[in-house]
Amino acid sequence: MNKWLCCALLVFLDIIEWTTQETFPPKYLHYDPETGRQLLCDKCAPGTYLKQHCTVRRKTLCVPCPDYSYTDSWHTSDECVYCSPVCKELQTVKQECNRTHNRVCECEEGRYLELEFCLKHRSCPPGLGVLQAGTPERNTVCKRCPDGFFSGETSSKAPCRKHTNCSSLGLLLIQKGNATHDNVCSGNREATQNCGIDVTLCEEAFFRFAVPTKIIPNWLSVLVDSLPGTKVNAESVERIKRRHSSQEQTFQLLKLWKHQNRDQEMVKKIIQDIDLCESSVQRHIGHANLTTEQLRILMESLPGKKISPDEIERTRKTCKPSEQLLKLLSLWRIKNGDQDTLKGLMYALKHLKAYHFPKTVTHSLRKTIRFLHSFTMYRLYQKLFLEMIGNQVQSVKISCL
């Protein structure tokens, strides 16, 4: 009898468990002292707690959890659970406490949780690249660079990069790369020295300075007639007028005039006079030896069309470290229809805060922008512009960037 009784009890419990699991809302058994019966009551939903059990006349009474407490599942508890206190050191809030969820903390950017501590992500040394980037839950996974790939930096984010294909760049391979160094290519020394920058930051600032605060009628024609050397033809002027706004036309005209008159003594003299500005820009940002990853982040932060990883890699191979950033900014300006580079940089600086970008670099970029907007440079631009056009356009009020 005892054996049959045990089997019957097990079957009964299985039925009760199946019933409470399959029905919705989930149920629980409650003994009702008023009737002496076992009742199937509704459980309380997440975000609430049990106030009163059900009876034969009414359903279970559940009420919302008070502030700073929660329940995250269907339950029969008569109280809510208090939320965890504030996050620990080096942690940030991933999800705030609410009635259905506890406060969730995670390690801040660049760290992962190991036991109870937020440790820095592993940095892969030269010769090893990142196979799996670190997350708030796990450390960085490094892997040795295979044949044909390299990593020349210590980084917690940079993967192994493919060796440069010198022939695709029109260059010769003079030293084969390995796991820690890229292929070394040979090329045109003069092209490498000036890095193919069509308009430098200082020249761009100077050309944009020449835009009057109020465009006078036929301003572009007056400027064309006033510029020395080979004149920009009427067809080119009309094309500039069709494609660009009135504020952008002066910059486009001066850029074309410089290209057509690069061998003119006047242009050479202006470029020499701008050397003071260029030296200062190099002093501010020329020392910023940015990694490929940092250049990628900076280019991603600029508005508009983006510079591709291949273009960044090609620039790193064909430009000196001190000119790489300037070359990429020049490429960005061209790709975005000659957008104002300084305005693009100011936009990027607002967004770099989220990337923990080196403060020394952002500080240098801000100093460069302030320098190119300074009164000293305003006076230099004014002097150069008057030298360039002589005294033929005296009525034009010139504005600094």
From Swiss-Prot:
Subcellular location field: Secreted
Keywords: Apoptosis, Cytokine, Disulfide bond, Glycoprotein, Repeat, Secreted, Signal
Site, as annotated: Involved in dimerization: C400
Gene Ontology molecular-function annotations: cytokine activity; heparan sulfate binding
Signal peptide positions (record): 1-21
InterPro entries, per the entry: DEATH-like_dom_sf, Death_dom, TNFR/NGFR_Cys_rich_reg, TNFR_11, TNFR_11B, TNFRSF_decoy_receptor
Residue positions with a glycan: N98, N165, N178, N289
GO cellular component: extracellular matrix; extracellular space; receptor complex
SMART domains linked to this entry: DEATH, Ephrin_rec_like, TNFR
Induction: Up-regulated by osteopontin.
TNFR-Cys repeats: 24-62, 65-105, 107-142, 145-185
TM region(s), chain numbering: none
Disulfide cross-links: C41-C54, C44-C62, C65-C80, C83-C97, C87-C105, C107-C118, C124-C142, C145-C160, C166-C185
Keyword Repeat recorded: yes
Superkingdom per UniProt: Eukaryota
Keyword set includes Repressor: no
Pfam families: Death_TNFRSF11B, TNFR_c6
Boundaries of every Death domain copy: 198-269, 270-365
Gene Ontology biological-process annotations: apoptotic process; extracellular matrix organization; negative regulation of bone resorption; negative regulation of odontogenesis of dentin-containing tooth; negative regulation of osteoclast differentiation; negative regulation of tumor necrosis factor-mediated signaling pathway; response to arsenic-containing substance; response to estrogen
Subunit note: Homodimer. Interacts with TNFSF10 and TNFSF11.
Task of the protein: Acts as a decoy receptor for TNFSF11/RANKL and thereby neutralizes its function in osteoclastogenesis. Inhibits the activation of osteoclasts and promotes osteoclast apoptosis in vitro. Bone homeostasis seems to depend on the local ratio between TNFSF11 and TNFRSF11B. May also play a role in preventing arterial calcification. May act as decoy receptor for TNFSF10/TRAIL and protect against apoptosis. TNFSF10/TRAIL binding blocks the inhibition of osteoclastogenesis.
Protein name per the record: Tumor necrosis factor receptor superfamily member 11B
Taxonomic placement: Eukaryota, Metazoa, Chordata, Craniata, Vertebrata
Gene behind the chain: Tnfrsf11b
